[in-house]
């Protein structure tokens, strides 16, 4: 059947900010969907609050709303745009929950909007645990024994029947939020209490424990003619009990017998039919008891999910693209496969390789968090690798993580029993502990007993260990041994450490013996048909599939797995660079290993190499490209710190680096040399010094005065940074933080209190500067720029300051020798402009600045990298001629970027949320943007989009450090004028009352029960009578009362503000929300407004 012709306009809901459990994979899915809709002639309206996405590029959809994804806001967009249909299956749980709310509120019916891709009934059947149980039964499957509960009393009764341990799963949450394993009553109160709160329907499923069973997923698609295909089977290496997003997974499933696979397949097909998914995809999770083979259906997602992105990249089968076509009414046999161009989508993909995905965690950012892996997802990113066998794919995936100690090691003196005891608890180290225990002499039976990891995988670890012994014991590294090692995924560095030689020496020997990888193709059909999209992976096989190409290629190194400090923003710059270079006629090559991202889509670049971003793997890709037609050069400054770290080594190997040279990159990172650049430019940095020991650091701190900011050299995301107020704190820091970069000295800077921090993104071509944007931070200096809210254009900086910023940026760019993008952080204190740091690369603010000013900076940077000038780009229309981002006219729209933080995901071993206090080390996973005519409404939108809409009435708890009390008086007066009740502890309340401000006193936590019936702030928070918390930490109480209050508020979803600067902005936003209703405006309309403001009132007339 051909597509429907009645759908002229479709609203797509994105997934919003990157959070744990819902990440870049939805930008990848959404971007594909929008492209399909446009190709089919449909008008596309998009709502997504995340500016760091490709899908929110104004060129993609017809109307792009970077607005909060709340039912009320989406209803306004529907009222304004009047779409025919809503496609909610590509924006994760956020989009599904919003669609359900719009349906319940009657909005869809009122405006005649049809839901496509999934119907409400199918969503309810798939997501509602009680209804889904019935579905499984009717489909001939079995569910774990369970009870649905809505209160703690019901939960306690259910446990009488199920017995401990029980699994707790809330309805309608994603990434396992609020779920966990309860071993006793205390656990049940803690986990089930949180689960009832996180579930929008206050509904929780308690089920019998299936801990230690094997876990599988099937990725399915079905069309309206009842054609069903299984796109991919995925097996978790970790047994049930670890969230699938935190587990190492492998595709295709390795340990299923054919009969077991057919059983799972039959159940899946029956379930997808029973649920009624008839125009799209879903994934179904199973548990299989290794003892008796009993199969239990765990759950399904009636939408495109994290697993769909993995399955798409693993198979080359574009699930999101095909799901969108199905939603438009096509059937599978009518949709051609892009890769083969001969087979339809109804052909199930066939794999002649193995894919392994390994999660990446960020526990180092939350030292207080419990690192045990449970059913609540905690990983912040993932790496994927492809090999001809499991061992090769696993070892490639592990080295793709780029974390110290992520590659398998082979210590000869380990205690197998101690390692197995450690491995019996699921943590990030379980895989290496198990492999090393086997290396040290543990048996497969003992390892299975301790970990419940299937013996087939344990046998593969033994095989890797045997090859390691062969490498260690061989008299010489001959060709046969090197080939065997490489076929099992050993890197030159691993071989070197086993042979006590340098990786470069191993590489030399390997090349001399002619042991080089070949590149194979992901083609969906195991080479049965020709593949037209070059999507490659390396293997030490016999023949290569890289075809000769005309013209030299430009290679872009991606940013690897997402992590805190290096996320989707860098992928955005890589994708934009590819687009700009392809438009200019260059052949582009992308090298990356992150399955979630747009950059690893097979049609973004001319060729995609799905490879680890290590020196060894990148040099081999360059060699393959050289051999097949030549390389113009490599871009290293777009993907964050990952490719930047390789710049000098690549240059040393004779690889041409495009854009800013490695010498210039080093100059900006090197303390002493950069100080000379500033000196020559007549600019100042805060007083600073370097230290290699505590005595050194103490001497520098005494010279420049406390507080000081201490950090290691060469880090991204403020890793290991701290503000230190005393000698004791300095001693503690030196004792704990010297491991980060052992060969680099520690940096000690004077910390500027109460300074305004300014962030600048600019382009420089060697003669001319284009100032991309000047952002003013809302919090004072001292909070990492990635965690701080910022506004563009600045709201309190005068033209003279902007002129000084422009001059300083130009002098630094020229002094460093930048060709392309540079990001500089300034601090303005007592009217002195200090230079904090300069990064000659794409920064995490590039997407935000590009969206706010309507100028694609990363595209322009790529063109400068291949030799074009800013003047050329102005002439070509890529950069504006009349203005730049530092001289935006009055009347330009105001954009606010706000960080989104993952504190609810991380709990201490006692089960409390980790502290939400911000500092110089970055902790946010994502960002949102609020954009409007004025700052106050733009800021209000950013807070709503970040998940904590500000209250417009109610009770506000305030408790501030002494240094903030003067500021608080004015702010509290405004609160009272707005009709809020102010609640405070003794000291702060006394100050407020002396200034004529009524304040209700509550007891400090330590004084619980001592005051006359006032109750503590914690009791009031739990009773739901506090709507907003302002708590700024003082040196002493930061870890006691303050922490308890912030942790309780965070876990209860009450907005917590930790600086008076941000609280001031919140007050403006609350006033704006009270006085008028905000409107929704598309990016395209904002851009038109900006052009109108530039042209001036005459043009408008």
UniProtKB/Swiss-Prot annotation:
SUPFAM superfamilies: Carbamoyl phosphate synthetase, large subunit connection domain (SSF48108), Glutathione synthetase ATP-binding domain-like (SSF56059), Methylglyoxal synthase-like (SSF52335), PreATP-grasp domain (SSF52440)
Gene Ontology molecular-function annotations: ATP binding; carbamoyl-phosphate synthase (ammonia) activity; carbamoyl-phosphate synthase (glutamine-hydrolyzing) activity; metal ion binding
Record region (Carboxyphosphate synthetic domain): 1-402
Residues that hold ATP 2 according to the record: 711, 750, 752, 757, 782-785, 825, 837
Annotated binding of ATP 1, by residue: 129, 169, 175-176, 208, 210, 215, 241-243, 285, 299
Pathway: Amino-acid biosynthesis; L-arginine biosynthesis; carbamoyl phosphate from bicarbonate: step 1/1; Pyrimidine metabolism; UMP biosynthesis via de novo pathway; (S)-dihydroorotate from bicarbonate: step 1/3
Name of the protein in question: Carbamoyl phosphate synthase large chain
Species this protein is from: Micrococcus luteus (strain ATCC 4698 / DSM 20030 / JCM 1464 / CCM 169 / CCUG 5858 / IAM 1056 / NBRC 3333 / NCIMB 9278 / NCTC 2665 / VKM Ac-2230) (Micrococcus lysodeikticus)
Gene label: carB
